[in-house]
Every structure is written in structure tokens, then in C-alpha cells.
Amino acid sequence: MLISTFIISSLLSIALANPIPSRGGTQFYKRGDYWDYQNDKIRGVNLGGWFVLEPFITPSLFEAFENQGQDVPVDEYHYTKALGKDLAKERLDQHWSSWIVEADFQSIAGAGLNFVRIPIGYWAFQLLDNDPYVQGQESYLDQALEWAKKYDIKVWIDLHGAPGSQNGFDNSGLRDSYEFQNGDNTQVALDVLQYISNKYGGSDYGDVVIGIELLNEPLGSVLDMGKLNDFWQQGYHNLRNTGSSQNVIIHDAFQTWDSFNDKFHTPDYWNVVIDHHHYQVFSPGELSRSVDEHVKVACEWGANSTKENHWNLCGEWSAAMTDCTKWLNGVGRGSRYDQTFDYDPSQNQNYIGSCQGSQDISTWDDDKKSNYRRYIEAQLDAFEKRSGWIFWTWKTETTLEWDFQKLSYYGIFPSPLTSRQYPGQCD
């Protein structure tokens, strides 16, 4: 846990600086009052599948190709490329205007949530030569911030897709590409972040936006971590050079939980928050765990978070204990759980169970419902040991394990959020 806070003089007339010592003695710094990550809890949802398409969240957009006997695009890049600019713009305008509306923000607030994370791709603000992407997302983002303000919901703006892709995931916009650090791609991402910082990082949105995430899920195992660290630093300083003390959110790049304890902690860095994403469904070993083992791992996440020097929270997690959701692993890639994951034979050697009816609540018996409730409650307790949590995702078209609305409706997600049927799992 973090201990006492004391005030020191600031060279900036706009804010005070508070060095906060960790258990290990390292200090990190706070300025301004966008959000008190030290004492207040974020309880939020991601607005996934809105400005960055994901086939598993809105499969109908992609099934339209399948229904016409065409190849199914694997990501937004290929979706827009297949349709062409005009038709892609028409379909995506319809999607942007209907997937998330004011009623969603009202329902989010009504569920006791206080926060949304809004993923958006670089292409919403700047296009590369020959990019097939279409634009128009920005006006919907601006409207979303107005709705958030109306319902007292705070927001992170999350750069979810970078030029060339930072991870090769379909949710970066471009699957199976790892070109983020090649050519001008990194600079384009920095230019986009500069635009986001200039527009959304200051006082105009200071009562709504409480963080700008520099980059979602950069895949540290395939990227040059030295260059990635340079990117984070440049993005941080570009925001600070606007005069803003807005919180800077840094995803952990899938490094170990303590990897940032000695980074971004000098007086040159303040209001830095580390974003961890926690799932247990993307390897056969994780999928084979019992519910007790899932709970144990979740509680370990929480315990580790208390030992970190920086404020940190879980910016993505779900109820999933299978990878059965259609296209969760990508278009055409099947599931490890039922041994249909043909993409990687090394991860497709063991049959764990059937995916039949896995997302249909009518097939869930009481024991299964209880197990999912236990796992959700354990994660909530774990993540609230520090700054909070952001569930992935607010809603989907068809899946259950990843859908906050459906899980809440069926009583599997606690309501109120602090109610517990299985208290003390992480004590």
C-alpha cells in the first residue's frame, strides 16, 4: 500500500506536486485533481467494438460478408478495404450512431459504474497513404464526452490501434502485423497523441477525461522495448508540454507486474498510471484451471498490485473461463477449449470441453452460474485492492462471458457492485 502524502512547492503555478513514497522507498508524483487514484476506486466498463471493430463483439458486421459467400474480413483494415471508402463509411456511420447512444451512458451510471474507457484507432485522426480506413469517429467521441459529463462518468481516451499495429491483434485494426516501430509509424502515433493531448488533455475536458492511454497492449515480446520506452517518454512529455497535468496511462506491454517500479518515478514524471489487462483464457493451461485455481490466480493479481510503486488498475478483464466465443481468437481460428484452434497446433492438443451452448444462459446450471459469480467477485476484490477495474466490455451482440449488461441482467455480475455472495476470497 502507499503511505503518507505531503506537499512540496511547485514550479508550476497551475498545480501542486505531491511525491508519494512506496513501500520500497521510491517516490512518484501527483499534480492536479483530475482523479484521486490513491483513494477513489474506478468501477468501469470498456466501450469495446465501437470505434475499433472487433469481430467477436459485433459479428453481424462481418457475417454480412459470409452470408454473401465472400471471405470474412479479419479486422477493420480488411473490412474497410473490402467495402471501399463510400460503402464502408455508410455502414460504419450507421454502426457508430447506434452501437453506443445516450441511453447506454444512462444505463452505465444506473448500474453504479463511474467510468468508461473509450478505445479509438489512430485512423480516426490521421490516415497513412493508401489506408482503407474511413473517418468520422471524432464527432461521436465528442458526443460521448458530453453524455459522460451529463451522467457524471469519467473517461479514458485509449489509443487502441497504432500504425502498422503494435501487437498483431485484430483489435489493433490490423491483424498479424507488427510494424509499429518501422518507418514513420511511431511518429504518426506520436502525432496522433499530440492531437489527442491538445484537444482532450486540458481544461476543456478536465471535468470528464481523467486519463489518456498512450498505447493499448503493445506486445513487448516482439517489439524493441528500448524504442517502446522512448515512445512512452515522448508521448508523456508531449502531453506535459501542452501545460496539462492530465493522467498518462501506460499499458504494461505484458511485462511482469513489477517492471515499472523503477520507471517514470522521478520529479520529471507525475500522474502516471499503469494499466494491466488480466485474462485466463488464451492458453491451454489457463483454460484447464478449475474455478478454485482461477480465483487463486485472480487474488494473486490483486496481491501483486499492492506492491507496485505506481497507481495501477486492471483496464481489461472479463468473466471468461473459456475461449468459446465465436471469433474471440480471430476470424477462422476456432477455440482451444474444444480443440478447434487450428491456427496453432501447439495450443490445440487437448480437448477441455464442448463449446456448445457456452454463451447461452439457458444451458447454464446453478453450479456454473455460481462458479462464474465466484470468479467475478474474486476479480472485483482483487482489483479494488488498488485503483479499480474496467470490465471488457459493456455489451456484445451474442456472447455472455464478455458482456457486462447480460451478466448483470442474469445476476452473475454483482448488483450493487459491492454486494458479495462469496466474500473474503482474496483476504
From Swiss-Prot:
Upper taxonomic lineage: Eukaryota, Fungi, Dikarya, Ascomycota, Saccharomycotina
Main function: Beta-glucanases participate in the metabolism of beta-glucan, the main structural component of the cell wall. It could also function biosynthetically as a transglycosylase.
An example Gene Ontology biological process: glucan catabolic process
Organism domain of life: Eukaryota
InterPro entries hit by this protein: Glyco_hydro_5, Glyco_hydro_5_CS, Glycoside_hydrolase_SF, Glycosyl_hydrolase_5
Its EC number(s): 3.2.1.58
Keyword tags: Cell wall biogenesis/degradation, Disulfide bond, Glycosidase, Hydrolase, Secreted, Signal, Zymogen
Protein name: Glucan 1,3-beta-glucosidase 2
